Amino acid sequence: MDSLNSLKGRNLTMLVDFYEMTMANGYLKNGMGDTVAYFDMFFRKVPDGGGYVIMAGVEQLCEYLKGLKFTPEDIEYLRGRGFSEEFLDYLADFKFSCDVYAVPEGTPIFQAQFVETMVLLCINHQSLIATKANRIVRAAQGRPIMEFGSRRAQGFDAAIYGARAAYIGGCAGTACAVSDIMFGVPALGTMAHSWVQLFDTELEAFCAYAREYPDNCVLLVDTYNALKSGVPNAIEAFKRELLPRGYRPKGIRFDSGDIAYLSRKARKMLDEAGFEDCTIVASNSLDEYLIRDMIGQGAKVDSFGVGERLITSSSSPVLGGVYKLCAVEKDGKICPRIKISDNVAKISTPCFKKPWRLFDRETGKAIADLVTLNNEVIDDTKPYEIFDPDFTWKRKIVENYVAKPLTVQLFKDGECVYECPPLDEVKRYCAEQIDTLWDEVLRFDNPHNYYVDLSQKLWDEKQRLLAEHGKKGEQ
């Protein structure tokens, strides 16, 4: 079970891209080992062509950073790869000493060298799954979504932490029991087709299950013929085993077929038998689009189990978060750095920065995000002009708004100063934050482009660096 423990019990210090080590060794050899540098982690493209991404993975990132330590075995491995003794001595005595700021988990977002890999790994994966889960939850229009994807996840960590992220995104629970043990994500589940197949008859299987679990009896009715045998046998089992003992059935589940059609027929059969309170659960390779269509077609489904298309975010399986240097300190002064590309979208934004979210004071809805220099303060008692950083003639004066900083400090001088909230609190916070977004941002198809703007001072600094490097390129 150690391998399935939380990050608190695992030393993942060497889970790095190898070039992080070669660069760190080079910095030390070139007298740059004590240089203070600033890095940004951000993304450029929203999965599934959506309008937002949900921040997740912060707790695991904190656990990783608190546990950074190179073991003697790590040192010997690196010695065998030809790293200098000076660098190995540095790693043997290594202590994490950075300041880290992050957007809290559950926040919708729009758009230290060797920690790069794990920073991206923790945040990219869980943010991707939390976002996909939230899309699916919203498609269900209040009907509970259960995460059923463990067996289809890409590795056991993806199953475990994917279930955690799905819960943040709004899922009611998971089939992954270890995620309940580790994080308190409610474990849910009933039976598989193998239960029915193991008995001589479907009715016998249903009756045995009802006797064993009378207070949580959900029967899988599509092993043989859903409408001709499955639903009728479920009704008979309910009458034989539950009603005489004072119990009511919890539900039936379909895992195949035309579920919109089957659920309508089954609902009628259950109601006629006096089981109006018996719920209908649907699974079978579902996603937000299929769920939306099923509901639009009048499906009588009360909850959904969603597996592979959630836990892998199969329609958009990668969140392309990146990690870029944005400034270094020289002689006590923060000097901005920029990364330039022929692809305009890949030009980084320099400087030590602070992100803000502007909310309409009357509606509570988010107006735009604003990225400023770290020492800038937004006075929300005064009108503020925001503008598109690419199409600068697009400008808007914002009034009657509230400006809130988006980030919290996680680490100060290498010490964790942030207390990660309980997962249920993160889930509630996520739902509250999603409610601050306009429907136009939340729609699945061609969502409104939520504005992420730069302050005038930050935009000016970016243009200055672009011009400066442009002149260097001409020489």
Regions found by a protein language model. Name each.
Residues D2-T35, F39, R44, D48-V53, ...:
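Gly/Ser/Thr/Ala-enriched C-terminal appendages of enzymes
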Residues Y38-R79:
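Low-complexity, highly charged intrinsically disordered N-terminal segments
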Residues L61-L68, Y77, R81, Y90, ...:
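Residues that form generic nucleotide/phosphate-binding pockets
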Residues E63-L65, A102-P104, I109:
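An N-terminal, globular interaction/scaffold subdomain
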Residues H193, S283, G307:
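Residue-level "edge-of-site" marker
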